[in-house]
Amino acid sequence: MVKKFFITAFVLLSGLAVSAQTLEKMNWFNEPSQWNITNNKLTMSVTPKSDYWRISHYGFTVDDAPFYYAEYGGEFEAKVKVSGDYKARFDQAGMMIRIDHENYIKAGIEYVDGKFNLSTVVTHHTSDWSVITLNKPVDFIWIKAVRRKDAIEIFYSFDDKEYTMMRNAWMEANRPVKVGMMGASPDGNGFNVTFSDFSVKHLPDAVRTEWLEHNK
């Protein structure tokens, strides 16, 4: 009985370790001038006049905002807590899932005309933008992304317990993606943002799981 207990405990602890992401081992794309990692929290000063956007509506393409990421294959659930000192129009921070400069999804909080919005940009050659306006300011938000088959589901939460979907978008299946934390200040002089409790948990491949279920 004791032996069984220790084996079970080891398995549970191992599972937690797999889902946790050590921030020090991640990589920068467009590293900002100031950033710090303390107690597995990332704080950065978002680069002024930086963003991610391709072509549609505005007519320009930019790919120069700070993005701190690790690369993952297969299917997964990723989440992060975001708290920012948003100041200027379009200041934004959240999670990004990226294949390359023409294929990515970014989702989080975006500050527009004095209001806080849950914002998602989906880019496949050209970008689109969807928002959900919040009725009051928030100190922080949780963003969760679930990759299954050829789709990414994006959720938000105010307490890391009850999650609400904000977007379901296509993303090419069976390609490694960069997953991490992003901030942008397209119209401003930058701002400070803190990301905490970032984690990525592997999920069993849905197609393979379905095949195994039907071929027992």
Where are these regions (language model features)?
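Bacterial Sec-dependent N-terminal signal peptides
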Residues: 1-22
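Extracellular glycan-recognition regions
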Residues: 21-216
